[in-house]
């Protein structure tokens, strides 16, 4: 059966192994998830450098093919949120407007092996991912 897809998502581990490198070569849009915490940024610069090296033949501006998705956002963590945003200062133009808020329903959905939109569609996590989907589709149509 020959299926046609508008979008294919390749979800890679947060390592720079063979699968990730191959996915970077094959893709035409990259979403880089970044947790709102100190340790999440440790490998961030390496990943961005690898993306630059892999995508160096692409003449499009970065804003056209890469976006950083901030996850596990908690508005109560003002100091750490500010610190993370300061660290990402050079990448502000690559940030999705949507942030995925910290939400226990997302963890529970992972354990249940169900999408958050099925597991708990009224949760803030489901709302955030729905908003992300709309933003992503808008970017793809530009």
Mark where each language-model region is.
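Conserved catalytic-core segment of NTP-binding enzymes
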Residues: 2-97
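Hydrophobic residues within well-ordered, non-membrane alpha-helices that form the packing/core
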Residues: 51, 133-136
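Short aromatic-enriched loop/helix-cap "lid" or pocket-rim segments at secondary-structure transitions
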Residues: 79-82, 108-112
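Active-site donor-binding loop signature of nucleotide-sugar glycosyltransferases
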Residues: 98, 102, 121
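Short, glycine-rich, amphipathic interfacial segments at transmembrane boundaries or analogous
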Residues: 102-108
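C-terminal boundary of histidine-terminating zinc-finger modules
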Residues: 109-131
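Short, hydrophobic alpha-helical segments
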Residues: 136-142
